[in-house]
Amino acid sequence: MSSALRAWFHTALSDLRTRLRDRRLLMMVAACVYLGHLVLAGRIELTLVDRSYRGAANAAWMGTVLSLTAAFLLTLFGFYLVRGALSRERQGRTAPLVAASPVRSVTYLLGKWTSGTLFLLVLAGSMAVSLAVLFVLRGEGLPAPVPLLTPFLLFVVPTAAVVTAVALAFECLPGLGGTVGGILYFFGAVAATVAPVLGAAPVDLLGMGVIHDSMSQAVLAQYPEADPGAMFSFGYYRAPAEQLKTFQWDGVAVTADLLARRAGLVLAGGALAAGAALPFDRFDPSPSWRATLRSALPGPNTSTPKTEATSTEPPATAGPPTAGHPSGPEGRPDAPAPAESAPWSLLGSLSAPVALRPFGLFAVECRRALRRRSGTWQVGALVLVGAGLWIPGSTGLLVVAWLWPLPLWSDLGARETATRTAPLVASSPYPRAQRVAAWAVGAAVPLALLAGPLLLGGHWRALVGVLFVPALGLAAGRLSGTPRLFEIVYLVLWYVGLASRQAALDFGGVAHAPPGTLVGYGLAAAVLLVGAVTAPHTA
């Protein structure tokens, strides 16, 4: 084995071990097992001709439905599960070791890509294992392994490879490693899943077109009067479909052309991961081009070291006498006698109580939150405030305004973990008050952005979202330690409840949510806030 292959293997193995040691893995596997149960129970169903035809429940059909479910979920959420491979090196303080190692950037990134792909396949594989176990428990015997696993290899593996490569490339590209990249990917993932249904997909990542064509041929061969249409119906149903006509289908025909196209997606993912080495900074601590330009412009240069001539600090006052530096009349006859009350005696006890100043704490949290936002974000916020006052009745403006503070909300509970200041906050005099102040800042920002719609447009229902969303961000950040959990949950709620105008999940006053929805979000806000504030700090 050459040195490059050895480095690739050990990089992938080390990163995969780190991912598998994550305490959240068990919850993710449990969710995948439950999804396997939903597939077998008929709650996640694939039908043709307006939900009139479905395949016979054999291994090929169940394996295809399971593979489509896994590929769909990996496309939407896999990015957020594998993102952070490079930031984990920075937070773990192993970045200098990687930067100084002889491993090439291409080899290092390919190792990260391999481990992320395998991690997603572990999650998807748990769905396949659970489906096989449930088959046995229902007394139907062990399903045939080849028809069950063939769609998994054809459709899930390429999806996992491409999603991991995109996540790695976003981390290497400047400006896309944070919340902005997560938002852009979410819209791209939705487009990748919707475009095949509309017949306008240049690349069929999930393989929907191939599966539909194969099923359509089987339906027409057994039911000539049927019209399969442009695409099948695939989704979650509260109750299994009844009185459906079944057709026998033995799976997608594996041809050389199909294998070449699906393998090409895997190779494209590897090429994208290798190409990410071009913008990859290899954890270079040198300042960015913005900092370099700022230092070249006229103005105060904060990088200039202070000397005795340039220092603005006052001279040191008298300190306690030491053996090496005698003070007082005995040590220096020409020195004045020290004051009767030495300066260090004015420090007082470190255990003296500190008065809580709520407004001062809120102002500090507000400065911390806004200081981390870019100038573009702040200008956009001002534009949204002005637009809200100009056209307060626009629901489209509401949808955009509810998306704009996402970077701020995602930092509410995860900021201390990312900056390694969580122990300091936990040992401060009022850690719970600090969390309440952070939530208040998260509520004040959307309140300012939505001032026009709230005061002039009559969208008072948005107030429940003002209370709920920052509580969700604070609780999710404190639970996971990263912004990814909140980003996943919130983007789904935003897309379904606001962008898709589903009143049952509307928290932003867009679709006129019923009273039950408003009460539910209000209770959820109270529970999440109390839990996030009172939960003890964990290292």
Predicted segments with their positions:
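Helix-loop-helix units of permease transmembrane domains in multi-pass membrane transporters
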Residues: R21, L81-G125, W409-A448, G452
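Terminal transmembrane helical anchor/hairpin motif
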Residues: R43-G55, G182-G275, P279, R484-A539
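Secretory targeting signals
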Residues: A30, G36-L48, S52-F72, F77, ...
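Juxtamembrane/interface segments at transmembrane-helix termini
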Residues: S87, Q91, L198-P202, A277-T292, ...
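Hydrophobic multi-pass inner-membrane translocation pores used for secretion
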Residues: R372-S374, L397-L398, W402-W409, G413-V425, ...
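Aromatic- and glycine-rich beta-strand/loop motifs that create alpha-glucan
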Residues: M1-C32, D284, W289, R294, ...
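Transmembrane helix-boundary elements of multi-pass transport/secretion proteins
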Residues: L13, R17, R23-A95, P353, ...
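Transmembrane alpha-helical segments in integral membrane proteins
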Residues: L73-R90, A161-C172, A260-F283, L456, ...
